[in-house]
Regions:
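Conserved Nudix-box catalytic region and its N-terminal flanking loop in Nudix hydrolases
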Residues: 50-93, 97
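Structural detector for helix-capping/boundary residues
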Residues: 74, 88, 101, 169-172
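Conserved hydrophobic/aromatic beta-strand scaffold that supports enzyme active sites
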Residues: 55, 127-129, 166-168
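Short, charged/polar surface micro-motifs in flexible loops or helix N-caps
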Residues: 45-53, 61-64, 77-78, 109-112, ...
């Protein structure tokens, strides 16, 4: 067990003003003394015109030099199911509005540390799969701007500050970017995306990542 302060935090990784850094309505200290939350995400894939995955690229709010790519999603609201949260977050972050019948899974269950510059958190996530057919992919492209970016009108002020891009990443381009040093979460996403494009086998992949960005 880590040493925790009287207010329940691990002082090595969590400053006493952590509630000013994170939204305390979403995050609560867990048994490790870390801010923790439950979240839901969507791995959005398309087959045409080229196999691609929809990714957000963002940076550390205290260090713009640290960046990573990840799938749309976020923390669950009180009383919200993971499917409801995944659909809401997808709509807010991308403008893509799907229904529960458009999702498969959860396909991945992930528990991970996020070591930001100022605070380390834990997030327990469920990932759902959305394989967009030609009609759904066209609907997604309809909300894309002239710069190739997806709709960002639903982003919060904080998201506008720390999220840098939202676009389709062709899988070959993603492989090259990761090979050149880009960090992607989950780390297995490039290979996982290729496998899920061929179909989901019904098995939930469990991922535990410690000490990550």
């Amino acid at each position: 067990m880590p040493h925790v302060t009287d207010d329940g935090r691990d002082p090595r990784r969590v400053p006493d003003n952590w509630r000013e850094i994170l939204d305390p309505s979403e995050w609560a200290l867990n048994h490790e003394g870390l801010p923790s939350r439950r979240a839901a995400r969507v791995i959005v894939l398309r087959q045409m015109p080229d196999p691609a995955v929809l990714l957000v690229v963002g940076h550390d709010f205290a260090d713009a030099g640290r960046s990573w790519a990840f799938t749309p999603g976020g923390g669950l609201r009180p009383g919200e199911s993971p499917v409801q949260g995944a659909l809401r977050e997808l709509a807010e972050e991308t403008g893509i509005r799907l229904t529960g019948s458009d999702l498969e899974g959860p396909v991945v269950e992930r528990s991970a540390h996020f070591a930001f510059n100022l605070v380390t958190c834990r997030q327990d996530e469920l990932f759902y799969l959305a394989r967009l057919d030609a009609e759904l992919a066209a609907r997604a492209d309809a909300v894309r701007g002239q710069d190739g970016q997806m709709d960002r009108s639903g982003w919060t002020p904080l998201e506008c500050d720390v999220l840098d891009s939202l676009r389709w990443w062709p899988l070959d381009e993603l492989d090259a970017a990761v090979g050149a040093g880009m960090v992607v979460h989950p780390q297995a996403l490039p290979a996982l995306a290729r496998r899920l494009l061929r179909g989901w086998d019904g098995k939930v992949l469990t991922i535990r990542e410690e000490g990550g960005d």
